[in-house]
Amino acid sequence: MSYMNNTFQSNYDYSKDKNFMSTDIGPSMREMKAQKRRSRPMDNPDADNPYIPKFISTAPWYAQDDDAVERLAHQRIGKKETPSGGRSSIEGSWYVRGKKLGPAATKYRKGACENCGAMSHKVKDCMERPRKRGARWTGEDIQADEVIQDINVSWDAKRDRWNGYDATDYKKVIERYEKLDELQNKGEENRDASENSAVKASRNSTVSGSEDSASITTPSLRMREDVVAYLRADNKNLQYEPKSRSMRDETGYHMVDDSSGGAGFVKASGGEKEDFEKLQMFAWEAERSGTRVHVVANPTAGELEFRKNKASRMTTQKHIDQSILDRYGDGTSKVKDKKAKNNEKEVPDLAILDKSEKSKGESNTDEESENLVIVEGDL
Protein backbone atom coordinates (compact mmCIF):
# COMPACT_ATOMS: atom_id res chain seq x y z
CA MET A 1 0.00 0.00 0.00
CA SER A 2 0.96 3.54 -0.65
CA TYR A 3 0.87 4.60 2.99
CA MET A 4 3.35 1.85 3.86
CA ASN A 5 5.79 2.85 1.17
CA ASN A 6 5.84 6.54 2.02
CA THR A 7 6.93 7.16 5.57
CA PHE A 8 6.10 10.85 5.54
CA GLN A 9 2.62 11.76 4.22
CA SER A 10 0.40 14.80 4.33
CA ASN A 11 -2.78 14.94 6.38
CA TYR A 12 -4.92 14.74 3.26
CA ASP A 13 -3.17 11.60 2.01
CA TYR A 14 -3.40 10.00 5.43
CA SER A 15 -7.14 10.60 5.73
CA LYS A 16 -7.75 9.33 2.19
CA ASP A 17 -5.85 6.13 2.89
CA LYS A 18 -7.78 5.71 6.16
CA ASN A 19 -11.14 6.00 4.40
CA PHE A 20 -9.94 3.50 1.83
CA MET A 21 -9.09 1.06 4.57
CA SER A 22 -12.46 1.48 6.23
CA THR A 23 -14.28 0.80 2.99
CA ASP A 24 -12.26 -2.29 2.45
CA ILE A 25 -12.58 -3.65 5.98
CA GLY A 26 -16.26 -2.68 6.62
CA PRO A 27 -18.25 -0.29 8.88
CA SER A 28 -16.60 1.09 11.96
CA MET A 29 -17.55 0.22 15.52
CA ARG A 30 -19.41 3.53 16.02
CA GLU A 31 -21.58 3.00 12.97
CA MET A 32 -22.39 -0.52 14.08
CA LYS A 33 -23.60 0.74 17.49
CA ALA A 34 -25.73 3.41 15.86
CA GLN A 35 -27.35 0.87 13.51
CA LYS A 36 -28.11 -1.43 16.43
CA ARG A 37 -29.70 1.47 18.39
CA ARG A 38 -31.93 2.37 15.44
CA SER A 39 -33.03 -1.19 14.86
CA ARG A 40 -33.98 -1.74 18.55
CA PRO A 41 -37.51 -0.54 19.35
CA MET A 42 -37.96 1.78 22.40
CA ASP A 43 -39.64 0.10 25.31
CA ASN A 44 -41.35 3.28 26.65
CA PRO A 45 -41.21 6.37 24.44
CA ASP A 46 -42.96 8.49 27.15
CA ALA A 47 -40.34 7.72 29.77
CA ASP A 48 -39.04 10.69 31.78
CA ASN A 49 -35.70 12.04 30.74
CA PRO A 50 -33.61 12.34 33.91
CA TYR A 51 -31.35 14.92 32.27
CA ILE A 52 -34.08 17.56 31.83
CA PRO A 53 -34.17 20.05 34.74
CA LYS A 54 -37.32 20.28 36.80
CA PHE A 55 -37.98 23.95 36.00
CA ILE A 56 -38.19 22.91 32.32
CA SER A 57 -39.92 19.55 32.66
CA THR A 58 -42.75 20.92 34.85
CA ALA A 59 -44.34 24.29 34.22
CA PRO A 60 -45.32 26.31 37.33
CA TRP A 61 -49.00 26.36 38.22
CA TYR A 62 -49.33 30.11 37.77
CA ALA A 63 -47.91 29.96 34.21
CA GLN A 64 -50.31 27.36 32.86
CA ASP A 65 -52.88 28.50 30.33
CA ASP A 66 -55.09 26.29 28.17
CA ASP A 67 -55.26 28.77 25.31
CA ALA A 68 -51.50 29.42 25.15
CA VAL A 69 -49.27 27.44 22.80
CA GLU A 70 -46.99 25.02 24.60
CA ARG A 71 -43.49 25.67 23.29
CA LEU A 72 -41.70 23.16 25.49
CA ALA A 73 -44.15 20.30 25.07
CA HIS A 74 -41.39 17.98 23.92
CA GLN A 75 -39.62 18.48 27.24
CA ARG A 76 -42.65 18.23 29.53
CA ILE A 77 -43.26 15.19 31.65
CA GLY A 78 -46.45 13.36 30.82
CA LYS A 79 -49.47 14.70 32.70
CA LYS A 80 -50.72 12.43 35.42
CA GLU A 81 -54.32 12.24 36.45
CA THR A 82 -54.76 14.07 39.73
CA PRO A 83 -57.93 14.99 41.68
CA SER A 84 -57.35 18.63 40.79
CA GLY A 85 -57.56 18.01 37.04
CA GLY A 86 -53.98 16.96 36.35
CA ARG A 87 -52.43 20.24 37.54
CA SER A 88 -50.21 21.09 40.43
CA SER A 89 -52.23 24.19 41.24
CA ILE A 90 -55.63 24.60 42.82
CA GLU A 91 -56.92 26.79 40.03
CA GLY A 92 -60.67 27.18 40.29
CA SER A 93 -60.94 25.51 43.71
CA TRP A 94 -59.97 26.69 47.14
CA TYR A 95 -61.23 26.47 50.68
CA VAL A 96 -64.69 27.96 51.06
CA ARG A 97 -64.66 30.37 53.95
CA GLY A 98 -67.61 30.77 56.27
CA LYS A 99 -69.88 28.25 54.53
CA LYS A 100 -72.16 26.19 56.77
CA LEU A 101 -73.55 22.67 56.34
CA GLY A 102 -77.28 23.22 56.54
CA PRO A 103 -79.16 24.22 59.68
CA ALA A 104 -77.73 23.91 63.15
CA ALA A 105 -78.51 21.06 65.52
CA THR A 106 -81.15 21.44 68.20
CA LYS A 107 -79.20 19.81 71.02
CA TYR A 108 -75.62 19.10 71.90
CA ARG A 109 -73.96 16.09 70.22
CA LYS A 110 -71.22 14.01 71.72
CA GLY A 111 -67.76 14.96 70.42
CA ALA A 112 -68.82 18.44 69.31
CA CYS A 113 -67.20 21.70 70.35
CA GLU A 114 -67.94 22.42 73.99
CA ASN A 115 -68.12 26.15 73.34
CA CYS A 116 -70.38 26.54 70.26
CA GLY A 117 -71.65 22.96 69.69
CA ALA A 118 -70.34 22.47 66.10
CA MET A 119 -68.95 19.08 65.07
CA SER A 120 -66.39 20.43 62.62
CA HIS A 121 -63.81 21.53 65.21
CA LYS A 122 -62.77 21.23 68.85
CA VAL A 123 -62.69 23.78 71.66
CA LYS A 124 -59.07 24.83 71.07
CA ASP A 125 -59.85 25.57 67.39
CA CYS A 126 -63.14 27.39 68.04
CA MET A 127 -63.32 30.89 66.60
CA GLU A 128 -66.50 31.90 68.43
CA ARG A 129 -66.51 34.17 71.46
CA PRO A 130 -65.69 32.16 74.60
CA ARG A 131 -68.88 31.69 76.57
CA LYS A 132 -69.17 31.68 80.33
CA ARG A 133 -71.10 28.40 80.06
CA GLY A 134 -70.60 26.54 76.81
CA ALA A 135 -73.16 24.80 74.63
CA ARG A 136 -72.26 21.48 76.21
CA TRP A 137 -73.79 22.53 79.53
CA THR A 138 -76.52 24.92 78.39
CA GLY A 139 -77.59 23.33 75.08
CA GLU A 140 -78.45 26.78 73.71
CA ASP A 141 -77.33 28.68 70.61
CA ILE A 142 -75.66 25.71 68.93
CA GLN A 143 -73.81 26.73 65.78
CA ALA A 144 -73.98 24.90 62.45
CA ASP A 145 -71.09 22.79 61.18
CA GLU A 146 -68.59 24.36 58.79
CA VAL A 147 -67.76 22.99 55.36
CA ILE A 148 -64.44 21.13 55.48
CA GLN A 149 -62.82 20.53 52.10
CA ASP A 150 -60.06 18.08 51.33
CA ILE A 151 -58.13 19.55 48.40
CA ASN A 152 -55.16 17.56 47.18
CA VAL A 153 -52.53 19.88 45.78
CA SER A 154 -48.87 19.51 44.99
CA TRP A 155 -45.99 20.26 47.31
CA ASP A 156 -45.30 23.62 45.62
CA ALA A 157 -48.94 24.68 45.67
CA LYS A 158 -49.22 24.01 49.40
CA ARG A 159 -46.24 26.21 50.15
CA ASP A 160 -47.01 28.99 47.71
CA ARG A 161 -47.74 32.22 49.60
CA TRP A 162 -50.08 33.54 46.86
CA ASN A 163 -52.09 30.34 46.59
CA GLY A 164 -55.78 31.13 46.88
CA TYR A 165 -55.34 34.84 46.28
CA ASP A 166 -57.93 36.48 44.08
CA ALA A 167 -56.39 39.29 42.05
CA THR A 168 -59.80 40.85 41.45
CA ASP A 169 -59.89 41.95 45.09
CA TYR A 170 -57.22 44.53 44.33
CA LYS A 171 -59.66 46.35 42.06
CA LYS A 172 -61.46 47.60 45.16
CA VAL A 173 -58.23 49.16 46.43
CA ILE A 174 -57.67 50.85 43.07
CA GLU A 175 -61.23 52.20 43.03
CA ARG A 176 -60.83 53.59 46.54
CA TYR A 177 -57.63 55.42 45.63
CA GLU A 178 -59.20 56.75 42.44
CA LYS A 179 -62.06 58.23 44.47
CA LEU A 180 -59.58 59.87 46.84
CA ASP A 181 -57.69 61.35 43.89
CA GLU A 182 -60.92 62.74 42.44
CA LEU A 183 -61.84 64.38 45.74
CA GLN A 184 -58.34 65.83 46.07
CA ASN A 185 -58.47 67.24 42.54
CA LYS A 186 -61.88 68.78 43.22
CA GLY A 187 -60.56 70.39 46.40
CA GLU A 188 -57.56 71.82 44.55
CA GLU A 189 -59.82 73.21 41.82
CA ASN A 190 -62.10 74.84 44.40
CA ARG A 191 -59.09 76.30 46.22
CA ASP A 192 -57.66 77.68 42.98
CA ALA A 193 -61.02 79.18 42.09
CA SER A 194 -61.33 80.83 45.52
CA GLU A 195 -57.79 82.22 45.26
CA ASN A 196 -58.50 83.60 41.81
CA SER A 197 -61.70 85.22 43.05
CA ALA A 198 -59.84 86.77 46.00
CA VAL A 199 -57.16 88.14 43.68
CA LYS A 200 -59.78 89.59 41.37
CA ALA A 201 -61.62 91.16 44.30
CA SER A 202 -58.41 92.73 45.60
CA ARG A 203 -57.62 94.12 42.16
CA ASN A 204 -61.10 95.57 41.84
CA SER A 205 -60.88 97.13 45.31
CA THR A 206 -57.53 98.74 44.53
CA VAL A 207 -58.85 100.11 41.25
CA SER A 208 -62.06 101.43 42.78
CA GLY A 209 -60.26 102.79 45.84
CA SER A 210 -62.24 100.79 48.42
CA GLU A 211 -60.28 98.41 50.62
CA ASP A 212 -61.93 95.42 52.16
CA SER A 213 -60.83 94.12 55.55
CA ALA A 214 -59.95 90.76 54.01
CA SER A 215 -57.80 92.34 51.31
CA ILE A 216 -55.71 94.45 53.71
CA THR A 217 -52.28 92.88 54.14
CA THR A 218 -49.17 93.95 55.96
CA PRO A 219 -46.47 95.48 53.74
CA SER A 220 -43.61 93.08 53.10
CA LEU A 221 -41.17 95.91 52.27
CA ARG A 222 -39.82 98.61 54.60
CA MET A 223 -40.85 102.17 53.98
CA ARG A 224 -38.26 104.61 52.67
CA GLU A 225 -38.65 106.92 55.68
CA ASP A 226 -38.26 104.10 58.19
CA VAL A 227 -34.99 104.05 60.13
CA VAL A 228 -33.53 101.09 61.96
CA ALA A 229 -33.63 101.30 65.76
CA TYR A 230 -29.84 101.20 66.21
CA LEU A 231 -29.34 104.02 63.68
CA ARG A 232 -31.61 106.53 65.37
CA ALA A 233 -29.99 109.71 66.67
CA ASP A 234 -31.87 109.71 69.99
CA ASN A 235 -30.65 106.22 70.92
CA LYS A 236 -26.99 107.03 71.51
CA ASN A 237 -26.71 104.96 74.69
CA LEU A 238 -28.33 101.88 73.16
CA GLN A 239 -26.42 98.87 71.93
CA TYR A 240 -27.59 96.12 69.64
CA GLU A 241 -27.03 92.59 70.91
CA PRO A 242 -27.00 90.17 67.96
CA LYS A 243 -27.44 87.06 70.10
CA SER A 244 -30.87 88.07 71.40
CA ARG A 245 -31.53 90.45 68.47
CA SER A 246 -32.59 93.20 70.84
CA MET A 247 -31.62 96.73 71.85
CA ARG A 248 -30.12 97.13 75.32
CA ASP A 249 -28.85 100.05 77.35
CA GLU A 250 -25.33 100.50 78.72
CA THR A 251 -25.87 98.06 81.57
CA GLY A 252 -26.90 95.32 79.19
CA TYR A 253 -29.34 93.77 81.64
CA HIS A 254 -32.52 95.82 81.31
CA MET A 255 -34.54 95.75 78.16
CA VAL A 256 -35.29 99.04 76.48
CA ASP A 257 -38.93 99.99 76.05
CA ASP A 258 -39.32 100.31 72.32
CA SER A 259 -42.58 101.36 70.75
CA SER A 260 -41.56 100.40 67.22
CA GLY A 261 -43.05 96.94 67.21
CA GLY A 262 -41.03 95.18 69.91
CA ALA A 263 -37.46 95.59 68.70
CA GLY A 264 -36.23 95.02 72.25
CA PHE A 265 -38.27 91.88 72.87
CA VAL A 266 -36.62 88.91 74.54
CA LYS A 267 -37.98 85.72 76.01
CA ALA A 268 -38.92 85.78 79.66
CA SER A 269 -36.28 84.34 81.97
CA GLY A 270 -36.51 83.14 85.54
CA GLY A 271 -38.47 80.51 87.40
CA GLU A 272 -37.58 76.90 86.66
CA LYS A 273 -35.27 77.95 83.84
CA GLU A 274 -33.16 80.03 86.22
CA ASP A 275 -33.09 77.22 88.80
CA PHE A 276 -31.98 74.74 86.17
CA GLU A 277 -29.21 77.06 85.00
CA LYS A 278 -27.97 77.42 88.58
CA LEU A 279 -28.02 73.65 88.98
CA GLN A 280 -26.09 73.22 85.75
CA MET A 281 -23.47 75.75 86.85
CA PHE A 282 -23.11 73.93 90.17
CA ALA A 283 -22.60 70.61 88.33
CA TRP A 284 -19.87 72.14 86.14
CA GLU A 285 -18.08 73.69 89.11
CA ALA A 286 -18.34 70.42 91.07
CA GLU A 287 -16.86 68.50 88.14
CA ARG A 288 -13.92 70.90 88.02
CA SER A 289 -13.29 70.38 91.72
CA GLY A 290 -13.37 66.59 91.34
CA THR A 291 -16.93 65.78 92.45
CA ARG A 292 -18.84 63.80 89.84
CA VAL A 293 -22.33 65.30 89.47
CA HIS A 294 -24.36 64.73 86.31
CA VAL A 295 -27.62 66.63 86.11
CA VAL A 296 -28.98 64.82 83.04
CA ALA A 297 -28.00 61.26 83.98
CA ASN A 298 -29.02 61.51 87.64
CA PRO A 299 -31.04 64.69 88.27
CA THR A 300 -32.21 63.65 91.75
CA ALA A 301 -28.69 63.19 93.08
CA GLY A 302 -27.64 66.45 91.47
CA GLU A 303 -30.54 68.31 93.10
CA LEU A 304 -29.69 66.86 96.53
CA GLU A 305 -26.02 67.80 96.19
CA PHE A 306 -27.02 71.30 95.10
CA ARG A 307 -29.28 71.74 98.14
CA LYS A 308 -26.61 70.45 100.51
CA ASN A 309 -24.05 72.79 99.04
CA LYS A 310 -26.47 75.71 99.25
CA ALA A 311 -27.27 74.99 102.92
CA SER A 312 -23.58 74.66 103.83
CA ARG A 313 -22.77 77.93 102.08
CA MET A 314 -25.57 79.69 103.96
CA THR A 315 -24.37 78.38 107.33
CA THR A 316 -20.77 79.40 106.64
CA GLN A 317 -21.91 82.86 105.55
CA LYS A 318 -23.91 83.25 108.76
CA HIS A 319 -20.88 82.29 110.86
CA ILE A 320 -18.73 84.81 108.99
CA ASP A 321 -21.29 87.59 109.47
CA GLN A 322 -21.66 86.81 113.17
CA SER A 323 -17.90 86.81 113.72
CA ILE A 324 -17.62 90.21 112.01
CA LEU A 325 -20.44 91.62 114.16
CA ASP A 326 -18.87 90.28 117.33
CA ARG A 327 -15.50 91.80 116.48
CA TYR A 328 -16.48 95.16 115.01
CA GLY A 329 -20.14 95.58 115.95
CA ASP A 330 -22.97 96.50 113.72
CA GLY A 331 -22.70 100.33 114.23
CA THR A 332 -26.12 100.73 115.82
CA SER A 333 -24.74 101.19 119.43
CA LYS A 334 -22.65 104.25 118.43
CA VAL A 335 -25.62 105.85 116.78
CA LYS A 336 -27.71 105.27 119.89
CA ASP A 337 -25.02 106.87 122.10
CA LYS A 338 -24.87 109.94 119.87
CA LYS A 339 -28.63 110.31 119.93
CA ALA A 340 -28.69 110.00 123.72
CA LYS A 341 -26.05 112.71 124.10
CA ASN A 342 -27.95 115.03 121.81
CA ASN A 343 -31.12 114.44 123.78
CA GLU A 344 -29.32 115.23 127.04
CA LYS A 345 -28.05 118.51 125.62
CA GLU A 346 -31.38 119.53 124.23
CA VAL A 347 -33.55 118.55 127.23
CA PRO A 348 -32.59 120.59 130.42
CA ASP A 349 -32.87 119.47 134.01
CA LEU A 350 -36.18 120.00 135.89
CA ALA A 351 -34.49 121.81 138.82
CA ILE A 352 -32.83 124.29 136.48
CA LEU A 353 -36.18 124.89 134.79
CA ASP A 354 -37.83 125.61 138.18
CA LYS A 355 -35.13 128.08 139.22
CA SER A 356 -35.24 129.94 135.94
CA GLU A 357 -38.99 130.16 136.05
CA LYS A 358 -38.89 131.50 139.64
CA SER A 359 -36.28 134.10 138.76
CA LYS A 360 -38.28 135.14 135.72
CA GLY A 361 -41.39 135.50 137.87
CA GLU A 362 -39.60 137.64 140.49
CA SER A 363 -38.12 139.91 137.82
CA ASN A 364 -41.50 140.42 136.29
CA THR A 365 -43.06 141.40 139.65
CA ASP A 366 -40.23 143.90 140.34
CA GLU A 367 -40.69 145.56 136.97
CA GLU A 368 -44.41 145.85 137.54
CA SER A 369 -43.87 147.44 140.97
CA GLU A 370 -41.39 149.94 139.52
CA ASN A 371 -43.83 150.85 136.83
CA LEU A 372 -46.51 151.36 139.42
CA VAL A 373 -44.25 153.61 141.50
CA ILE A 374 -43.42 155.73 138.52
CA VAL A 375 -47.05 156.10 137.70
CA GLU A 376 -47.93 157.16 141.24
CA GLY A 377 -45.11 159.77 141.23
CA ASP A 378 -46.42 161.26 138.08
CA LEU A 379 -49.82 161.54 139.52
UniProtKB/Swiss-Prot annotation:
GO terms for molecular function: pre-mRNA 3'-splice site binding; zinc ion binding. Residues 195-217 have a biased composition (Polar residues). A zinc finger (CCHC-type) spans 111-128. Residues 184-194, 327-363 have a biased composition (Basic and acidic residues). Its main location: nucleus. The keyword Zinc applies. Signal peptide: none annotated. Keywords: Metal-binding, mRNA processing, mRNA splicing, Nucleus, Spliceosome, Zinc, Zinc-finger. One of its GO terms (cellular component) is spliceosomal complex. Pfam families: Slu7 (PF11708). It is found in: Nucleus. One of its GO terms (biological process) is generation of catalytic spliceosome for second transesterification step. Residues 23-50, 184-217, 309-379 are annotated as: Disordered. Belongs to the 40S cdc5-associated complex (or cwf complex), a spliceosome sub-complex reminiscent of a late-stage spliceosome composed of the U2, U5 and U6 snRNAs and at least brr2, cdc5, cwf2/prp3, cwf3/syf1, cwf4/syf3, cwf5/ecm2, spp42/cwf6, cwf7/spf27, cwf8, cwf9, cwf10, cwf11, cwf12, prp45/cwf13, cwf14, cwf15, cwf16, cwf17, cwf18, cwf19, cwf20, cwf21, cwf22, cwf23, cwf24, cwf25, cwf26, cyp7/cwf27, cwf28, cwf29/ist3, lea1, msl1, prp5/cwf1, prp10, prp12/sap130, prp17, prp22, sap61, sap62, sap114, sap145, slu7, smb1, smd1, smd3, smf1, smg1 and syf2. Belongs to the SLU7 family. Involved in pre-mRNA splicing. PANTHER family: PRE-MRNA-SPLICING FACTOR SLU7 (PTHR12942:SF2), STEP II SPLICING FACTOR SLU7 (PTHR12942). This is Pre-mRNA-splicing factor slu7. It comes from Schizosaccharomyces pombe (strain 972 / ATCC 24843) (Fission yeast).
